[in-house]
């Protein structure tokens, strides 16, 4: 064994061994308990970042630990390979998205191997290959036949210059992010999957997810947004149709003083024919991108349509306004306004001088003061005719019943959740498998024409999708009739909604899933990824699992038993102000810093001498140039050091502050482990451990070893507090470093301790542990070694600490054998100088003894 720890030599050797032996490849084995450990698959952007490294290290630690428990562990990896960034990169680099993507996959695969992750590479998949997306296309056609897929026209952000649809986040200050053209709202036909048909089940089954973070479950509950209320129909004078609104507060209905409709509502459109002001307002709304988050804060605007609706209970005429806070996509495109008891309605009514009618009493029973704001709390009704005096619940039911009896109301359960729009007008995605025949019939692509393959050898102009630009691509024949293929592609959330199931049978050619393999491995035992995926990906992931269950492919209700959301990785951020006042961000690697005595940064500059402004720790990002390249760190310190720091610096679900001093500390620790094993093995073979022959000191050290095994097992397995597990191993290492190594049993005990330490560290730092296990002559490869088991007998304390009091005051603390008698404890106490001093020349009148804890001598 060489004396120095050289990670660059051992890591590549160990990785080659894993590759050649196919160590982490697994198959179904009914005789073993399975464990499916999965990290969210990466987008092949070109290089791994520290967020990836943290996510995958957590997964690898859990997978390796479960494997050492003797389980059949599946840990696969793949590539979420479709998506918009590839199109931008292709245009920029004058290539096509496919070669750019495949090059990135090859590069990042090497980076993953360099970090020593124990993946089953035989199951690797890339979602941009026809072998993968063909089954997604087939499944979509089956959902269409079941009535779960439909096409409808819906409003999108449209860039007239690029001739493309933009996501909300691609619209900046009302303009296209790419060409700065003013964005328009445009109605275009799109494909939807009916996730709303599963809304109740998606909501109710959250209660089954005992091992998912409450924050994620709450976010999903709010996103699904189930509410109970009443749908109310209004007659509108001089208008051919009724107006329908939905409310969760029918108790306030007598205070409804106006209605508001979306700018795109047919009533507003009709009114605009003779109202130029309204027509201009509708035009303004059409070109305003409205994301839900922005609606709460934006200025509320409106125009009176001139139409009057009739309040069904009071018979009063109330105005109908077009307002920018009502969206056609939500509900009926019309809302009832109760300005006395809803703050948004109050602000709008105050702005435009509309009637504000209070109908709920304040908590003290007085009429509410509405001079400053609405009263939004629930309470007792007044000013409401026959409903006066009713509380919220009674009024809700009484008004709902009355409206229902009159035929103008209906109790309804509503959801905030909308059906999933899966159409994208982009090129780099899976083609949607639908065709339109010459006679206008729309139908799924026949099975014998699947997969609909996306051509990869294309020229990108950065504006139009190549399959939209090429009229020949869309032409096909169905049932002997000319037809046109759909040129939209799937939302990339489609691919990431079922990949976890395809990992169980990546080579299966008879269908989407091999049910036998899928049901052996599923559900996933632990799924690891960022909390930013709480509502989109993790909701679609659950939805797809239920769709596959209802298609008979899987037999479980939920895709993953446990969800672990790792925290973000933060790093120092620095900038200097340029000549034009702009901020130039400088990488923390290039910052030369001065710190105060507490280690805080007080001054910084870069190599060029610029004075740097330190903005604190923030999430690693390109925009702040504060990302740390994992590859550089691995080359500098080794993969094991990077992995150990990642797991030690912070609890897995909390933010991690990147500190190179911490990385250096992790590296020093591994050098100490190496040194101790080197010194131990240099002394030659070791005798067998004779537990009965150990001295008290040796027993105490062995007790520490086995207590550490018990703690680390609990920390990794049950608590998943990996940082405290590492801290416990470090503490034990400090004791081992000071332990005597001369006697035969000293060395035998050290052998037992080091074999345990190396196995406990193995999930975190597998390369060094693989090597040290061999040097310690452990049996076989450490990858097949069992997890160490704590010896209960060794952990039993044979001595205990007893507090000695004289007349209730503590005079000494003594160590006695656990089974010592009261007499023996008294005798031992009497040997203590301070106790003897207070007993001198006095009589012990009473003895209070709590075995193993307390001895109180009452003297007088």
Swiss-Prot record:
Subcellular location(s) of the protein: Cytoplasm
Pfam families per record: Anticodon_1 (PF08264), tRNA-synt_1 (PF00133), tRNA-synt_1_2 (PF13603), tRNA-synt_1g (PF09334)
Annotated TM spans: none
Name of encoding gene: leuS
Extent of motif 'KMSKS' region: 619-623
Motif ('HIGH' region): 42-52
Source species of the chain: Shigella sonnei (strain Ss046)
Catalytic reaction(s) noted: tRNA(Leu) + L-leucine + ATP = L-leucyl-tRNA(Leu) + AMP + diphosphate
Stored InterPro entries: aa-tRNA-synth_I_CS (IPR001412), aa-tRNA-synth_Ia (IPR002300), Leu-tRNA-ligase (IPR002302), Leu_tRNA-synth_edit (IPR025709), M/V/L/I-tRNA-synth_anticd-bd (IPR013155), Methionyl/Leucyl_tRNA_Synth (IPR015413), Rossmann-like_a/b/a_fold (IPR014729), tRNAsynth_Ia_anticodon-bd (IPR009080)
GO cellular component, one term: cytosol
UniProt name for this protein: Leucine--tRNA ligase
Binding site for ATP: 622
EC assignment: 6.1.1.4
UniProt-listed GO biological process terms: leucyl-tRNA aminoacylation
């Amino acid at each position: 064994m060489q004396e120095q720890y050289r990670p660059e030599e051992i890591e590549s050797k160990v990785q080659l061994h894993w590759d050649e032996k196919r160590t982490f490849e697994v198959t179904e084995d009914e005789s073993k308990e399975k464990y499916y450990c999965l990290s969210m698959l990466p987008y092949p952007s070109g290089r791994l970042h520290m967020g990836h490294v943290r996510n995958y290290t957590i997964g690898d630690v859990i997978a390796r630990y479960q494997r050492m428990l003797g389980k059949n562990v599946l840990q696969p990896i793949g590539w979420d390979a479709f998506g918009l960034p590839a199109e931008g990169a292709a245009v920029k680099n004058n290539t096509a998205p496919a070669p750019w993507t495949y090059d990135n996959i090859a590069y990042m695969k090497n980076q993953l191997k360099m970090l020593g992750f124990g993946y089953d590479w035989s199951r690797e998949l890339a979602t941009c290959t026809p072998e993968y997306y063909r089954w997604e296309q087939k499944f979509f056609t089956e959902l269409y036949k079941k009535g779960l897929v439909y096409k409808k026209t819906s409003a999108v952000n449209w860039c007239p210059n690029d001739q493309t649809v933009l996501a909300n986040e691609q619209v900046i200050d009302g303009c296209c992010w790419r060409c700065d053209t003013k964005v328009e709202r445009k109605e275009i036909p799109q494909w939807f999957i009916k996730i709303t048909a599963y809304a109740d089940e998606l909501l109710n089954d959250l209660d089954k997810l005992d091992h998912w973070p409450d924050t994620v479950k709450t976010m999903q509950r709010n996103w699904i947004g189930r509410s109970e209320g009443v749908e109310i129909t209004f007659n509108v004078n001089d208008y051919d149709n009724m107006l329908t609104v939905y409310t969760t507060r029918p108790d306030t209905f007598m205070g409804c003083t106006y209605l508001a409709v979306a700018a795109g509502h047919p009533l507003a459109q009709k009114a605009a024919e003779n109202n130029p002001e309204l027509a201009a307002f509708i035009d303004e709304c059409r070109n305003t991108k409205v994301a839900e988050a922005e609606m709460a804060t934006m200025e509320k605007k409106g125009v009176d349509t001139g139409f009057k609706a009739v309040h069904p209970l009071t018979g009063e005429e109330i105005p109908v306004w077009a307002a920018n806070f009502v969206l056609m996509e939500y509900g009926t495109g019309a809302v009832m306004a109760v300005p006395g008891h809803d703050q948004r309605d109050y602000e709008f009514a105050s702005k435009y001088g509309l009637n504000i009618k209070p109908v709920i009493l304040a908590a003290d029973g007085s009429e509410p003061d509405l001079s400053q704001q609405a009263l939004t709390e629930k309470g007792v009704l007044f000013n409401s005719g026959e409903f006066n005096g009713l509380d919220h619940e009674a009024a809700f039911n009484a008004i709902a019943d009355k409206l229902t009896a009159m035929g103008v109301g209906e109790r309804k359960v509503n959801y905030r959740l909308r059906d999933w729009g899966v159409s994208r007008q982009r090129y780099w995605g899976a083609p949607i498998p639908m065709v339109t025949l010459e006679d206008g019939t729309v139908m799924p692509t026949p099975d014998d024409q699947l997969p609909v393959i996306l051509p990869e050898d294309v020229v990108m102009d950065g504006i139009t999708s190549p399959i939209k630009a090429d009229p020949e691509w869309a032409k096909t024949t169905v049932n002997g009739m000319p037809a046109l293929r759909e040129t939209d592609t799937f939302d990339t959330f489609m691919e990431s909604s079922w990949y976890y199931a395809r990992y169980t049978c990546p080579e299966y050619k008879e269908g989407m899933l091999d049910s036998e393999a899928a049901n052996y491995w599923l559900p996933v035992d632990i799924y690891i990824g960022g909390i930013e995926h709480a509502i989109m990906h993790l909701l679609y992931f659950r939805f797809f699992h239920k769709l596959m269950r209802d298609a008979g492919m899987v037999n479980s209700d939920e895709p993953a038993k446990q969800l672990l959301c790792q925290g973000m990785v933060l790093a120092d951020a620095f900038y200097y102000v340029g000549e034009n006042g702009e901020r130039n961000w400088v990488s923390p690697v290039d910052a030369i810093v001065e710190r105060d005595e507490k280690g805080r940064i007080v001054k910084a500059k870069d190599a060029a001498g610029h004075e740097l402004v330190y903005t604190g720790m923030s999430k690693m990002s390109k925009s702040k140039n504060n990302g740390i390249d994992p590859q550089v760190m691995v080359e500098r310190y080794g993969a094991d050091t990077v992995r150990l720091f990642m797991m030690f610096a912070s609890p897995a679900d909390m933010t991690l502050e990147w500190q190179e001093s911490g990385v250096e500390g992790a590296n020093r620790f591994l050098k100490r482990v190496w040194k101790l094993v080197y010194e131990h093995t240099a002394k030659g073979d070791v005798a067998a451990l004779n537990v009965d022959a150990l001295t008290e000191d040796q027993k105490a050290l062995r007790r520490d070893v086995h207590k550490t095994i018990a703690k680390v097992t609990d920390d990794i397995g049950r608590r998943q507090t990996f940082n405290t597990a590492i801290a416990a191993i470090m503490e034990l290492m400090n004791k081992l470093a000071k332990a005597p190594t001369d006697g035969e049993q000293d060395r035998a005990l050290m052998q037992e301790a080091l074999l345990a330490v190396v196995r406990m560290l193995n999930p975190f730092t597998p390369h060094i542990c693989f090597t040290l296990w061999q040097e310690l002559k452990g049996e076989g490869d450490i990858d097949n070694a069992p997890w160490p088991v704590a010896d209960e007998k060794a952990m039993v304390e044979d001595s205990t600490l007893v507090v000695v009091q004289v007349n209730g005051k503590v005079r000494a603390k003594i160590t006695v054998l656990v089974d010592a008698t009261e007499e023996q404890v008294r005798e031992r106490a009497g040997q203590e100088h301070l106790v003897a001093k207070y007993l001198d020349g006095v009589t012990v009148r009473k003895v209070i003894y709590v075995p193993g804890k307390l001895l109180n001598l009452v003297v007088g």
